[in-house]
């Protein structure tokens, strides 16, 4: 079974996990880097995206929004042009505000792959500090995964995609991290509100 087949079977077993306004889908483009570019006419903000295997998210940009259609405005004046840097294969999906990301590997990845995915998690968490990044390996987990996957919130082993108990554990794990992400976001928001309240006194 290919990695994409495992992913598609998994999403079929997870699709009822959350309800609106949250979504759970595959191959969701998630921002990992923002680049500001000054120009003579208007400044530009480039939003670069990674496509993630399975994501619990809210919509940031609808999939119908094209690469250069978004802007930051003040009244009727455009202040910044927004450029969505995503490949054409990502245009069939909404661009997401991630709460839980589940990255899937069919076999135990090598050290270089683990480091790459861990760095990817770090970049995403820099923009979305509340986001939970889970790393799922279909099969056993080697010790090097724990040594090098320092930015993963949890490393999961799935050995049989048709085992109801394993799927239940996975569902419970995703919901646990979804709750953690929402609580973290609340904490971040409360701190901002409290800070603003202090500055008004």
Language-model features: where?
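Conserved catalytic cores of phosphodiester-cleaving nucleases, focusing on short active-site segments
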Residues: 54, 98-106
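N-terminal targeting/trafficking signals and adjacent low-complexity tails
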Residues: 4, 8-11, 61, 66, ...
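Active-site-adjacent loop/helix micro-motif of nuclease/hydrolase catalytic cores
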Residues: 64-68, 107-118, 144
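Short, solvent-exposed amphipathic alpha-helical segments in soluble enzyme
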Residues: 118-121, 151
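Active-site metal-binding core of divalent-cation-utilizing nuclease and nuclease-like domains
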Residues: 25-94
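C-terminal tail/extension regions appended to the core domain(s) of diverse proteins
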Residues: 1-46, 126-201
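Conserved catalytic-core segments centered on acid/base and nucleophilic motifs
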Residues: 102, 124-125
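Short, well-structured alpha-helical interface segments that form or flank functional binding sites
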Residues: 5, 49, 97, 109-119, ...
